[in-house]
Amino acid sequence: MLFTVSCSKMSSIVDRDDSSIFDGLVEEDDKNKAKRVSRNKSEKKRRDQFNVLIKELGSMLPGNAREMDKSTVLQKSIDFLRKHKEITAQSDASEIRQDWKPTFLSNEEFTQLMLEALDGFFLAIMTDGSIIYVSESVTSLLEHLPSDLVDQSVFNFIPEGEHSEVYKILSTHLLESDSLTPEYLKSKNQLEFCCHMLRGTIDPKEPSTYEYMRFIGNFKSLNSVPTSAHNGFEGTIQRTHRLSYEDRVCSVATVRLATPQFIKEMCTVEEPNEEFTSRHSLEWKFLFLDHRAPPIIGYLPFEVLGTSGYDYYHVDDLENLAKCHEHLMQYGKGKSCYYRFLTKGQQWIWLQTHYYITYHQWNSRPEFIVCTHTVVSYAEVRAERRRELGIEESLPDATADKGQDSGSDNRINTVSLKEALERFDHSPTPSASSRSSRKSSHTAVSDPSSTPTKIPTDTSTPPRQHLPAHEKMAQRRSSFSSQSMNSQSVGPSLTQPVISQAANLPVPQGMSQFQFSAQLGAMQHLKDQLEQRTRMIEANIHRQQEELRKIQEQLQMVHGQGLQMFLQQSNPGLNFGSVQLSSGNSSNIQQLTPINMQGQVVPTNQIQSGMNAGHIGTSQHLIQQQSLQSTSTQQSQQSVMSGHSQQTSLASQTQSTLTAPLYNTMVISQPAPGSMVQIPSSMPQNSTQSATVTTFTQDRQIRFSQGQQLVTKLVTAPVACGAVMVPSTMLMGQVVTAYPTFATQQQQAQTLSVTQQQPQQQQPQQQQPQQQQPQQQQQSSQEQQLPSVPQPSQAQLTQSPQQFLQTSRLLHGNPSTQLILSAAFPLQQSTFPPSHHQQHQSQQQQQLSRHRTDSLTDPSKVQPQ
């Protein structure tokens, strides 16, 4: 008993120990799991923060168009920081340490302010006169762009009378520069002289004006300047010349006007597209000025409100601005020309304004004018003015700018053919110095003592040896057009000489490889343009030829240049044996071309064989035709045999192919006062019998059932076409007669008698010549009784063995040619079997009365035309 109790106690203790151990392990696992979760959260937070910082750093780096990985972002950041450190060290080395330089101004800002205060500009000249650098402030003083002066000779802008003096000043320092020492550069390198410099103009034809300038500076050795900066001249010196400049001396001078200007143009535009907004009254007074205006024009809003805008405009621009104002008041919106605006600092800035008139929302009256002013540079203004004058801007030379390659400015614009020809004519492209040499060589030499400030050129100066640009362009246009007109092929005649001349173009010694390759590119672009224009011209020629062909076909159809046959056949197996033409004078028959009828071509030899066969048909058609070229009257009669070997006679005046399309309407038109078509139900046995004629109006539709035979009279109005189109549902024979216009002397109504008979299939072909005589007599009797057509009886309708179509026309005493066309085409007997022939005729008669009731009108109500 005790043993069992002790065993139970021991087992309970063991179980308790096991459970405690298990609980401890579970708690330890929970703690580790919680630590792991918290560590993962902190790690994820750190990674997210790191990614955010990397992304922000990558967005600040330049050229971040594509997604960069972390290593690339860090590498670019390191490169940027290293470069920034070098630039900072260089700027600290060249920092102005004097006390008179304000600490809150950078070197560039201080230099710009000093140049504006001195009315001068910086000029760096080599001892041979080559200009390697010029500051942008030269624009406000001499109206030259820096690109006009850089890499040119200073003697191109100095009168010839002062060349020797300036050259002597520079050459003396050149001789002494062989033994350059730091002591010499500190003591004897001062340079000061005065001379005249050429003022720039928008129009080169204007008389040249010289300004009296003062040069103050010193000489500097280029090898003593840090190679990375060259004191700001790094981007200006060409790489091809940089090695030769390393051991030479340049003169850095401040060039000032001897007589300062009180008001001058702003020399630089930091942000050319900077803009501000203002509102004006209809009298052009300021009503509003936004917050962007004061940094640009210097005026605060309250300083200009109520004042007129014309108070701030240059006097030379007032006329153009007044015209722009009138245009605005007329059209309600527009864009102004380039004009000069006077700032508060007494400087002129160039602006261009987009404006529009706003209207009151209730009464729609003009309220005020909203203007958006944009700052533009003088280079844009000069280029626009020269384009208006028809002067092409000279291409800038291959000069390197700061942070850019040396050839970045030497891009050739190949937009138009004219510019390409202009470049090709001037190839090899002259350098800027040669252009300036020609510019200054035609100016007269003036005495500096006589005109201390400005020297206008003499008007008697001989003109330049070369023609102006617009005259050259006119000559090139005339020669170019004459060459293109005289050549057989547009493309080869223009492209081959140009390409061959470009291929054989020698490369001058002073011309860089880049310029030559650019000219070759221009020639290739010219070739592509000419080839494209050639393809366009050829396409236009083909299209015009196609349109002309269609017009000729329509004219032949409308004005009766030939007889056109339009055929509607119910059975596609219908064959035409031959076509016979008979005329009063067989010598007048010309060559005939094949006739295309519903996809089947009747060749000329078949027509001629039909002409020689001389078969006689069972029906005749009389047609009067007026000829535009013949002066004699010809009358011919034409007959065609119909049967298993059918023949059609056709008179044609043209040699073009006649096409027979399908139509489902019937049109009989002529310029006569009126025409009538009589369609009897069947041919009577003798012509003495009488029948009633049903007449219906012009605007009512004729409806014929399949296989139905009717007696109708159709009155039609004159229409300017000559075609008869037969519907497929009419069993009146498958012949379409086309006739041209008639003479205006035809005054009376004309009647067409159309008679149908169903051909007899069992009748042999040998009996047809025997039936010719009674049928001709029957036709003559019908022509005499045209006003009334006899109507056969029911027995005659059922016993009619043959069906044919006869069309007759009244002939008038007209001097024009008369053609007689007769054709007969039997219906296909395979449509109805012989055993059911009588039954089908009775069904046709039963449907006759119903169609007359629905479709035909009372003949008493119709007046013949």
From Swiss-Prot:
Residues the record marks as site: Interaction with E-box DNA: R39, E43, R47
Record-listed E.C. numbers: 2.3.1.48
Keyword field contains Ribonucleoprotein: no
Major location (coarse): cytoplasm
Pfam families (alphabetical): HLH, PAS, PAS_11
Post-translational modification: Ubiquitinated, leading to its proteasomal degradation. O-glycosylated; contains O-GlcNAc. O-glycosylation by OGT prevents protein degradation by inhibiting ubiquitination. It also stabilizes the CLOCK-BMAL1 heterodimer thereby increasing CLOCK-BMAL1-mediated transcriptional activation of PER1/2/3 and CRY1/2.
Chain segments carrying region Implicated in the circadian rhythmicity: 514-564
UniProt keyword list: Activator, Biological rhythms, Cytoplasm, DNA damage, DNA-binding, Isopeptide bond, Nucleus, Phosphoprotein, Repeat, Transcription, Transcription regulation, Transferase, Ubl conjugation
Positions of modified residues (Phosphoserine): S38, S42, S408, S427, S431
Coiled-coil segments on the chain, per record: none
Protein name: Circadian locomoter output cycles protein kaput
